[in-house]
A protein has these predicted regions:
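Short N-terminal edge-element motif at the start of the domain
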Residues: 1-55
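Solvent-exposed helix/loop surface patches that form functional interfaces
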Residues: 1-17, 23, 71-152
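Short strand-coil-strand connectors
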Residues: 8-12, 66-68, 86, 158-162, ...
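A short local loop/turn or secondary-structure capping micro-motif enriched for an aromatic residue
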Residues: 37-39, 67-70, 91-92, 164, ...
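Hydrophobic/aromatic-rich structural module bridging two neighboring secondary-structure elements via a short loop
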Residues: 37-85
């Protein structure tokens, strides 16, 4: 899988350029997000890189916000998260996936890791990363595979009381996350 996409942010003024490359023993995903909250005095640029193993488990995450605030996380893929210096982050224990608030790519991780059958539901603990603050917290999310149409798959996505139906392509990348993100064709 070598793919490049652009997503439009439909909640805020902004967009993301995203690329994913399959290497010998891993995937490398990179994104550059530009968005504005309110007026241009509250504009942000976010760059991130996610190193994944071939089963879509996050191994390493680097995020840089506004060219100077950064976050580096590492994971063993079994629910243990570490800072750059190797220090364990206890409050994230048990979470397997990341959810970076400013990108729809995060949804691809649990979707691509599982072999879904129609009407199957999966429950996940996610490391939620709030952008631009880089605050970390563990959150529960669920996906239910509800429909397919050719190469398109539809999932009911839920986090706490929020629920929506998202559409992904054959690579598991978001095409439509209603009123939040839409892929530019």
């Amino acid at each position: 899988m070598n793919q490049k996409v652009v997503w439009k942010n439909e909640e805020l003024f902004g967009c993301e350029y995203f690329s994913i490359t399959k290497e010998e023993k891993n995937f490398s995903a990179k994104g550059t997000i530009i968005y504005v909250e309110g007026d241009e005095s509250n504009a942000h640029i976010v760059e991130y890189k996610v190193d994944l193993d071939t089963n879509w488990f996050t191994k390493k995450l680097t995020i840089i916000v506004d060219e100077h605030n950064s976050l580096n996380l590492m994971s063993d893929g079994m629910g243990n998260w570490f800072k750059n210096d190797g220090q364990v982050i206890d409050k994230l224990k048990g979470a397997i996936d990341i959810d970076i608030s400013a990108t729809p790519f995060s949804n691809s991780l649990p979707i691509n890791r599982m072999d879904w059958v129609l009407n199957q539901e999966g429950h996940f603990e996610m490391v939620y990363i709030s952008i631009p603050s880089l605050e970390l917290k563990k959150v529960p999310q669920s996906y239910k595979y509800i429909n397919n149409n050719g190469n398109l798959r539809y999932f009911k996505y839920r986090c706490y009381d929020y629920e929506t139906t998202i559409c992904v392509d054959e690579q598991g990348l978001i095409l439509d996350y209603p009123n939040v993100f839409r892929r530019v064709k």
